[in-house]
């Protein structure tokens, strides 16, 4: 087992479980397949999901802070919502980072992709809950640069540069889409099957 894969597995162990109660391949086959709609995408606005990270809990930490706290590989700082420094592993591009300014919290299924996959029909409350979901494997700390490179792309057009992480990424993507009953495009489904082939 490579060092990259071992570190990725350590990080994923701290995150919500992938695939729920179904094997990923079974869950993938149950997803509705639909072509993407340019008309629906044209109506997408990030603000329909979130205008900032939600604060909740007794400590008042926001969602971003909670993701960084659970992903921090360094000893605790004693600060309830974490500090600006720590040690984070970005599994998409195999980088270890020590400054939160270098990090983004990625929506595994991007908000724009969720929108065209069915979230355009949801209530504002459901879209808000999706954007801040700490229960499913939807939020992961990664380097800012790799998150920018990913943008709103699905696996049909973007995959993590680290091939050893494809299996985890595909399972996470499928878990989120299956839970929220979001559709996939034919190319997206084909790409996910290919990525599951690395498991």
Give the location of each predicted region.
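N-terminal module-boundary/linker segments of secreted carbohydrate-active enzymes
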Residues: 16-58, 186-188
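Residues that form generic nucleotide/phosphate-binding pockets
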Residues: 27-34, 43, 47, 66-70, ...
């Amino acid at each position: 087992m490579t060092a990259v894969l071992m570190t990725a597995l350590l990080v994923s162990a701290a995150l919500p479980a992938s695939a729920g109660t179904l094997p990923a391949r079974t869950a993938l086959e149950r997803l509705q397949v639909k072509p993407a709609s340019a008309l629906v995408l044209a109506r997408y606005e990030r603000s329909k999901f979130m205008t900032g990270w939600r604060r909740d809990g007794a400590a008042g930490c926001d969602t971003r802070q909670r993701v960084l706290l659970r992903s921090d590989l360094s000893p605790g700082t004693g600060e309830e919502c974490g500090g600006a420094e720590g040690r984070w592993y970005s599994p998409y591009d195999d980088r270890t980072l020590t400054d939160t300014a270098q990090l983004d919290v990625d929506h595994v299924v991007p908000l724009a992709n969720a929108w065209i996959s069915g979230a355009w029909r949801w209530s504002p409350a459901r879209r808000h809950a999706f954007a801040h979901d700490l229960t499913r494997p939807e939020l992961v700390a990664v380097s800012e640069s790799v998150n920018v490179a990913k943008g709103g792309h699905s696996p049909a057009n973007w995959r993590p540069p680290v091939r050893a992480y494809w299996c985890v990424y595909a399972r996470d993507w499928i878990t989120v889409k299956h839970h929220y009953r979001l559709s996939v495009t034919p190319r997206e489904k084909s790409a996910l099957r290919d990525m599951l082939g690395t498991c």
